[in-house]
Structure formats: structure tokens, C-alpha cells
Amino acid sequence: MPDRRAIVTGLLATAAFPMASQGARLRKAISTIVPFKTSPFPYRGKLPDGSGPFLDVTANGRRGHTSPRGGIYWEDETYSDRSTLLAVPRGFDPARPAVIVVFFHGNGATLQRDVVDRQRVVAQVEASGLNAVLVAPQFASNAQDSSAGNFWTPGYFARFMTEAAQGLAKLTGAKAAKFDAMPVVLVAYSGGYNPAASVLRNGDVSGRLLGVILLDAVFDEADIFADWIARHRKSFFVSAYGQPSASGNAEIRQLLTSQGIDASSDPPRRLEAGTVALLTSDAAHDSFVTRAFLGNPLQWLLGRLHGFAR
């Protein structure tokens, strides 16, 4: 179920923060969790391979999904949260070159408890110095399930981003068209690999995608990531990983090598067109978003993206 306290707190905070006028820097940071119409869940469609319905269990009037890792999860508890986190750092200027950072969380997560508080994603984006806004949808709520839901459907993520642009426009006072035109950096942690792979495979917002950052996330779909890298040589791709996703990253490296594409093992000095880096780490998986090959890896990597200083 949605974290209603977080939603209410966010809405009250938004109302209290002064919006930026056209071409003005935001005087205070804004972070809010709001319901979206184009959210990943609820999802009443089929599994992506077409083998059957996503909701494959019924009992006492309830519908549920059988997760390979978590067993049966019920729609009303796990797959009904329409929440999306929208965050705008202090000093954001919609009149300057800017990017949208989209963050896909991992298993067992909720937006406020994990993305905001534990993993400090909002704080890392702000501390990066990037003139960026953050968008993070809720997937399966607090569950061992990596399902992408509606993001499996071609074109759905593009619709989600249109709604995000409208929400960001309301928060900042800038026009939605500005956010609709901004380049996108896609970040996925752990189980966020599945929706990330779906977005890349479907080609949603492909013309706006500056690059991809994966944080211990290649548990499957290595072929999709490698194919995307090969077909988008003007974008960047960085995957930092520990032991849990080492085999998936090794598969990406092998697939790239077979196509004559070199993947660096060193942290990139800059994130730019053609950057491909696979960075190993012995850091623990559960804290990987805050400590990987170095502390606060998302902050550090976003800080390597030039041309979008706040």
C-alpha cells in the first residue's frame, strides 16, 4: 500500500516551498511522493513472454502474483501502489541545461524508507552539483520481485515520463515542455534491472537517453544491456557491481568484446558519449547505493557528467 504519511508530508512540503519563476533558480529543495496515473502498478496484463497472466492466483476475492523468489504476493498489498518520488534540488535552474535522473529501486523497497532515507538517492543527486531533477517510481512494494509491470508495455514508460514532466512543472513553475525535452539518465539498483532492461528494449525515450548507470544490478538481461551499448555508441554505460551480479557483468563484457567494444575497468574521469565502464567492488549488496567502489557512488558518477552544472 502507498506510504500515505510520506505522500501527505510531501504534498504539505511542496505547498510550503516557493516555486521558481520562469528562468529563476529554485530557492529551496522540493521532495514529494505523489500518485501517478501511469504508474508501473497496478498491472493486469500478461507476463512479458506471453506465457500467462501476471496475476495468476485468486483466493477469497483477491488476486495475486507468484514471484519466483518471494512466493505469492497479493495485488492489494504489493502491486497497488501508484506512488512516484519527485525531487528538485535547491538551486535547480530550469533555464539552464538540465537532466532528469530516473531511479529504479531494488527488491524489498519503498520510496521513503529506502530510496530517500536509507540509500540517500535524493541527497546524492543534490550533492552531485548536477542541474537535475529526480524521478523514482514505486514498483512491487516491499517485495522480493523485480517485475516491471506496465513498463513491460512498449510506449508506457514514455507516457510515464510525460506525466512526470507535468508533475515537475507544477513543482517548479517551469513549463512541462522543458522537462519533456530534457535528456534522461537511467539509474537502476539490484532488481531495478528488469524495468531498466524493458525500457531499453522497448526504445522508450531513446532519443533523450544520455546514458545508463547500474548499481549491482545485472542479474539477468545481460544481452539486452550489451545490445543497447552496441547500438548507442553516443551514450554512456556504467555498471558498478559486487559478487552478486558479477556473472551478469562478465557476460556483458564478453558480448561487448565479441563486437570489438572495449569496456574499461577503471572509474571514468568523465561520463561522455561512448563511455563504457564495468567497475568491480567487494562492497556489500544491501548498502551498494551508498558504498560501492567508493562512497556515495551515484553522487560521484553524476558529478562526472559535464555540461549540466547547477
Q: Where would I find each of the regions flagged by the language model?
A:
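N-terminal export signals
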Residues: 6-23
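A domain-start/cap signature at the N-terminus of enzymes
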Residues: 23-99, 264-267
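Active-site machinery of serine-nucleophile hydrolases
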Residues: 106-165
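Conserved acidic catalytic loop of the alpha/beta-hydrolase fold
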Residues: 160-180
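Alpha/beta-hydrolase fold nucleophile elbow
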Residues: 177-189
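Glycine-rich nucleophile elbow surrounding the catalytic serine of serine-hydrolase chemistry
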Residues: 187-198
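A conserved short beta-strand
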Residues: 206-217
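C-terminal catalytic histidine-bearing segment of alpha/beta-hydrolase fold enzymes
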Residues: 239-250, 258-310
